């Protein structure tokens, strides 16, 4: 069993309006099937003076900036001061936190983005949770389904965890940096304050406070 990549170790629950709900789960992949019900529960209690309901089960903060060309399907919450840019494609089951950026031609599906998270340029993020201030460089994507369509298994060295999920993208801890054009394979988990080099192909778990160059070159950060 994987021990070092619990939700509590990866993210600050105070940095998402879903934090209290996520505390109910030990591992992040346990929460993925429940994102829709979390959004619906939160949406019903959002204050009308700060949020407006646009369409069925879509709540958008009045302070958020949403470009006219963006497509948003419910259930979805766009929290305060978030920016949904040109031609963003939000397919539903998406919670976009305070001050987040969802950029040009980016696609989201079944995700929670913690506050200040940025997916600003041509990113695909599906069946994933991205932590506070996590950033995905231009063109970096999450791959959320295996080519053989079997359930995703999360690997950490010799340890592993059966998720029971056919679809799981990536879990990024707070302050994670993903380099441009990287691919995060199904079941990737990246710890807090870890940097991934551009053009990387990542799978499995990467510990917090590391620099990932490739599978054979993962170095601990030194301050």
Where would I find each of the regions flagged by the language model?
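Glycine-rich active-site/cofactor-binding loop and its immediate structural neighborhood
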Residues: 60-62, 66-105
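Surface-exposed, flexible loop/turn segments at secondary-structure boundaries
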Residues: 72, 78, 90, 108, ...
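Glycine-rich hexapeptide-repeat left-handed beta-helix
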Residues: 18-19, 113-115, 120-223
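Short amphipathic alpha-helical segments with coiled-coil-like heptad repeat character
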Residues: 32-36, 90, 142, 184
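Terminal amphipathic alpha-helical/low-complexity segments used for targeting or macromolecular assembly
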Residues: 1-57, 62, 193, 199, ...
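Short gly/ser/thr-rich secondary-structure transition/capping motifs
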Residues: 46-49, 63, 119, 159-161
């Amino acid at each position: 069993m994987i021990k070092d990549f619990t939700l509590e170790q990866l993210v600050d629950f105070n940095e998402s309006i879903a934090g209290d709900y996520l505390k109910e789960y030990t591992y992040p992949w346990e929460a993925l099937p429940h994102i829709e019900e979390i959004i619906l529960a939160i949406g019903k209690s959002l204050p009308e003076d700060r949020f407006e309901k646009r369409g069925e089960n879509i709540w958008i903060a009045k302070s958020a900036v949403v470009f006219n060309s963006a497509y948003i399907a419910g259930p979805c919450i766009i929290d305060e001061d978030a920016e949904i840019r040109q031609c963003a494609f939000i397919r539903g089951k998406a919670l976009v936190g305070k001050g987040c950026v969802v950029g040009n031609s980016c696609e989201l599906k079944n995700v929670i983005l913690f506050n200040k998270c940025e997916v600003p340029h041509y990113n695909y993020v599906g069946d994933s949770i991205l932590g506070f201030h996590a950033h995905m460089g231009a063109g970096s994507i999450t791959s959320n389904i295996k080519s053989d369509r079997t359930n995703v298994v999360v690997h950490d060295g010799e340890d592993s965890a059966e998720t029971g999920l056919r679809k799981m993208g990536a879990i990024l801890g707070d302050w994670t940096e993903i380099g441009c054009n990287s691919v995060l394979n199904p079941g990737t988990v990246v710890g807090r304050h870890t940097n991934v080099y551009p053009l990387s192909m990542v799978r499995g778990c990467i510990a917090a406070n590391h620099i990932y160059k490739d599978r054979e070159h993962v170095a601990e950060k030194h301050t």
